[in-house]
């Protein structure tokens, strides 16, 4: 008898996971609380853009969507910093300046993944199903006005997961909210073209707050403000909004003709890091943000969730299709990696909002890139290891420490050699 799998959540991870499982010949029911977003439009409050990099592309390639994703994306090979005076400074993401992260519409990618899941034999999509509970012992799911049952239930329903809530009794659960929120705004095309360089992620670093802008294929930019929530609340009139932006982001104001109206109309989202254990209870397991929501400052949320799907699929192969063994292996493989990228994402907020504007940081970045070019793969920056490889997140800090020790030893040897040469020359004199 074919096992029936329930995936709760038809977002990015849920759709990818359903497709991977269907390719194993499994019957998969995907339950989504929203109406079909391909017909209902984007959900308010969700980030409009995603940054997809090597990990996400590797996962999407397994269902034949990597090339389509790149065709719909805009590559960003570095970041452009906007100072208070309007001066610009560019920092490439890679040593040779060629590697890029890719700006893509969240809605567009979700639609492509929904289409791919719907095409897969054995997948059934159920929209308008809001989960109210799941029994981890029986696999029984309760929705508003309906019930279902599955052999395995996979919760891919986001940071505020209803599946996680159903199994969280006795769970080691931590939800840490930043005092900052986020709000999205728009820089429209200017005379039919991009108002800013589209090959770059734009950052207005202002210490405790910042604004970023990512390009869209319609030649607009989606801007995201990261401010203390009290600052958002204080700007309650068009005049106050414009005054604050003229003070903090003066060069952006002329590019945003609907700034005040958009600011007052658009919601403020929360920034939360979720860590929990166990991810697996009985017939139920958590995937993506439901297991490990992270803040967006390394652009790895979707990439990390996609890696979960790949690891779960890989664990099924390793276990010979034994679900309890596969789920246990999946959690063991992914938990440390999720914790590692959660920490790095939090650290990157400080880098993006403060450090990138520092001349010292810029010099360090140039030196790191010089080392990468000189040492040919023996030294790779943390950013490149995270964004442009599939090396497990949990291994990156250890590799960085080993690199630093090696570089320190090489630098010490070079300095010693220079010193010895100077002494020898002095003696010859």
Task: Give the role of each language-model region.
Residues 1-13:
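Beta1/beta-strand and adjacent pyrophosphate-binding region of the FAD-binding site
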Residues 5-7, 28, 284:
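Conserved hydrophobic helix-helix packing surfaces used for dimerization/oligomerization
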Residues 10-23, 154-155, 185, 267-351, ...:
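Conserved mid-domain beta->alpha element of the FAD-binding
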Residues 13, 36, 160:
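Conserved Rossmann-like nucleotide-cofactor binding loop
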Residues 22-45:
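Glycine-rich FAD pyrophosphate-binding loop
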Residues 43-116:
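Active-site-adjacent segment of FAD-dependent monooxygenases/related oxidoreductases
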Residues 115, 120, 129-133, 138-267, ...:
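Conserved FAD-binding catalytic core of PHBH/FMO-like flavoproteins
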Residues 314-429:
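C-terminal helical "tail/cap" subdomain of flavin- and related membrane-associated enzymes
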């Amino acid at each position: 008898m074919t096992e029936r799998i329930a995936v709760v959540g038809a977002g990015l991870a849920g759709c990818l996971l359903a497709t991977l499982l269907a390719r194993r010949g499994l019957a998969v029911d995907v339950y989504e609380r929203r109406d079909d977003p391909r017909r209902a439009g984007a959900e308010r409050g969700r980030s409009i853009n995603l940054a997809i990099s090597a990990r996400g592309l590797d996962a999407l390639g397994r269902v034949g969507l990597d090339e389509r994703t790149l065709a719909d994306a805009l590559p960003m090979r570095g970041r452009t910093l906007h100072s208070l005076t309007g001066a610009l400074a560019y920092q490439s993401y890679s040593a040779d300046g060629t590697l890029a992260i890719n700006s893509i519409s969240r809605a567009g990618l979700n639609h492509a993944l929904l289409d791919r899941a719907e095409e897969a034999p054995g997948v059934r999509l159920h929209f308008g199903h809001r989960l109210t509970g799941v029994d981890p012992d029986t696999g029984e799911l309760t929705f508003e006005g309906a019930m279902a049952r599955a052999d395995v239930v996979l919760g891919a329903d986001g940071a505020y997961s209803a599946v996680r809530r159903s199994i969280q009794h006795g769970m080691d659960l931590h939800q840490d909210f930043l005092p900052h929120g986020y709000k999205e705004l728009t820089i429209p095309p200017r005379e039919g073209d991009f108002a800013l360089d589209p090959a770059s992620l734009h950052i207005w670093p202002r210490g405790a707050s910042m604004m970023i802008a990512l390009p869209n294929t319609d030649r607009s930019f989606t801007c995201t403000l990261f401010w203390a929530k009290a600052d958002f609340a204080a700007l309650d009139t068009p005049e106050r909004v414009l005054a604050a932006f003229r003070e903090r982001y003066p060069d952006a104001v002329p590019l945003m003709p609907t700034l005040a109206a958009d600011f007052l109309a658009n919601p403020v989202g929360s920034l939360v890091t979720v860590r929990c254990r166990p991810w697996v209870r009985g017939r139920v397991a958590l995937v993506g943000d439901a297991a490990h929501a992270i803040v967006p400052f390394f652009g790895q949320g979707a990439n990390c969730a996609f890696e979960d799907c790949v690891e779960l699929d890989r664990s099924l192969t390793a276990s010979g299709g034994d679900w309890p063994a596969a789920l246990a292996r999946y959690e063991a493989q992914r938990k440390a990696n999720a914790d590692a990228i959660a920490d790095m994402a939090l650290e990157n907020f400080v880098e993006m909002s403060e450090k990138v504007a520092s001349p010292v940081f810029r010099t360090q970045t140039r030196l790191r890139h010089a080392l990468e070019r000189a040492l040919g793969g023996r030294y790779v920056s943390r950013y490149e290891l995270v964004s442009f490889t599939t090396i497990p997140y949990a291994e990156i800090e250890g590799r960085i420490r080993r690199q630093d020790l090696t570089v320190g030893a090489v630098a010490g040897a070079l300095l010693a050699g220079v010193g010895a040469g100077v002494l020898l020359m002095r003696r010859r004199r």
